Amino acid sequence: MQDLLYFIQQLINGLTIGSTYALIAIGYTMVYGIIGMINFAHGEIYMIGAYTALIAITGLAALGIAWLPLILIVALVCAMIVSSSMGWAVERVAYRPVRGKHRLIPLISAIGMSIFLQNYVHLAQGSRNIGFPALIEGGFRFGAEDSFQTSITYMQITIFATTLVCMTILSLFISRSRIGRACRAVSQDLGMANLLGIDTNRIISATFVIGAALAAVAGLLLGMYYGSIDPLFGFIAGLKAFTAAVLGGIGSIPGAMLGGLILGVAESMTSGYLSGEYKDVVSFGLLILILLFKPTGLLGKPEVEKI
Amino acid sequence: MAAHNLKHALFCAIVTLIISYPILGFNLASEGTTVTLEGAKTSTIVGVLLAAVVVFLFQLFRDNLMGSLRQLPAVNPLANRKPMEQSKRLKLESTLLTLMIIGALVWPFIASRGAVDLSTLVLIYIMLALGLNVVVGLAGLLDLGYVAFYAVGAYTFALLSQYYGVSFWFALPIGALLAALFGLVLGFPVLRLRGDYLAIVTLGFGEIIRILLNNMTNLTGGPNGIGGIPDPTLFGMEFGRRVKEEGNTSFHETFGIAYSGEHKVIFLYLIALVLAVITAIAIRRLMRMPVGRAWEALREDEIAAKSLGLNRTAVKLSAFTIGAFFAGFAGTVFASKQGFISPESFVFLESAIILAIVVLGGMGSQMGVILAAIAVTILPELAREFSEYRMLIFGAAMVLMMVWRPQGLLPMRRIHIELKKQE
């Protein structure tokens, strides 16, 4: 019974982290699906979202506003606006001019952008980590009083619920809206979509904006969950999210969700049963293994090499 | 058209404000557990507003600006010059190289101790950049975990000296070979992957090595690192004031000169110089050998190279292993120079810096890479007050370089034969 409760606890923790990875992974997978590049600066956009949310929360607190839903919504909206503008600007400045060149060139440009953004926030806000207030406290507990108890905090429930809502909206947007349909067309064949009158530049920009907005949501959620942020925390999270995207099959949106959840659970099981220090080793190891044995991921389509 | 431009300019200006004002305009300060918000300095806010105005004006008049820029006569005097004849160019290059090496040999005897120490670091970066140049520049394999091989070299020497008392000269080949072995073992499975997947896998590998070094506390000392790494000896002569190991003599006593701490610094510099020159020459030779040609062929067109009978895996693996070998070299020298190493020195940023050197110098071009290594290491030292902006400028330079001049400052020129026109 004890063991089962412990296991369930790790599962819940893993799913919580995993669902936020999934949110970030969407940005990677959509961009890769359309223009076939790894947006290395995506982790930084997520970090900027978290910083903006914290600035908004602190600003509202200074103004004396204490109504929780209002604070959360304002922080969320601010973070999404700033992050999506950042996503748009990054694509415009660093990726559009090098689009279509040799594969390594956009990738190096993206690494440069990632270093630039990291240091931009580092210089503006300092390198120390800053406490993020836990606005949502409390939770449910299961199990006997005197032994190990499984708990689900309200924060975790909020994360699940928000992720679910975001994913539903995204799926509806991709499958029903005009831009969503254009996105799918462009990811199937960019040149053909262009010939058929789709403004591909706008669609690519839209992809970056959508991915950045979802990353900002993850930034706010994970900031509250972990309780502190620093300019470097986007890097590892971005890498994890990329792993999740590859795990699920890069280019596939349901794959990113599945990959995020699997990765989150794998990580929390490692921390729970082995040691927290090795969780990064496990996720990178997982990435290497997947790329070796099933480079298309769980839900990805095999790629045909054309001459 | 004008209305469309105005709308676009306004949009760009607003985006500039959105991405800069919240982050730059408010400073988060934490006192204990409470976080407070402070407004930024007026100068910062004025700067942000000014940036938005500049973006607005630029976008508004972009068509005119670009048009008038194009009408300007070509200012670049080198643009229309005839390429130098190949034999002349090679002669010029070798003269320059000889001069550089002579200059580098004289340098430690005229410069201050600090400058020589810094030059040793420059040489280590040159070795690293030349090694990575083989992998990225010649073979076209983007390796983002190059620092892992550097760490293997450094830790090999540190651990061997700590546990078995192995000296620098024994550890040097062992470190390099072990790093090469790591390259081989890692490369074997991952080199089948496509370019950008390879980048991520090597990045993951680099992080795994660093995390392992950090956590295997009883072997590597964890975050505390390993100290007391011995200096290299010259034929059994030590450079310390007192001889540490039995059977050795000390340098200053043998030659009957006064003890000076500078001897050791100069000696290390010379070792690094010799190794860097060896690295450069070895790679220069390799480039002209069939294997070097195969690297470039594979970089240019994998399918064509394959259909001409090249073994893809073997060619890639050789580049990867040779790159790792030289990183191991550099790592051993680094460990000996610092006398202390910890996982802090082997973070991803270090890989990114080495990559930036290769990219800035011009992928594949040895001369360019050497000059870029010197510039990237020395410029931040010269401009100390800007040192906090170093990485910001690095990142921006990488992006700008890719946008404007992806071939680098001193692009690689292929050795080729020109057909003479028939009379």
Predicted regions: what they are:
Chain A
Residues 2-20, 127, 152, 173-178, ...:
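Inter-helical junctions in multi-pass inner-membrane proteins, predominant
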Residues 20-28, 41-61, 86, 90, ...:
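Hydrophobic alpha-helical segments within and immediately flanking transmembrane helices
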Residues 34-37, 41-89, 93, 149:
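Membrane-embedded helix boundary and interhelical linker motif in transport proteins
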Residues 148-229, 253-258:
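Helix-loop-helix "hairpin" substructures at the membrane interface of multi-pass membrane proteins
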Residues 1-25, 52, 63-75, 101-105, ...:
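Membrane-interfacial amphipathic/re-entrant helices at transmembrane-helix boundaries
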Residues 19, 28-51, 100-105, 179-182, ...:
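Short, non-helical or kinked segments that cap or interrupt transmembrane helices
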Residues 97-98, 106-176, 203-206, 269, ...:
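Transmembrane helix-bundle core of multi-pass membrane transporters
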Residues 33-41, 85-131, 173-180, 235-250, ...:
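Short loop segments and helix-boundary regions at transmembrane helix junctions
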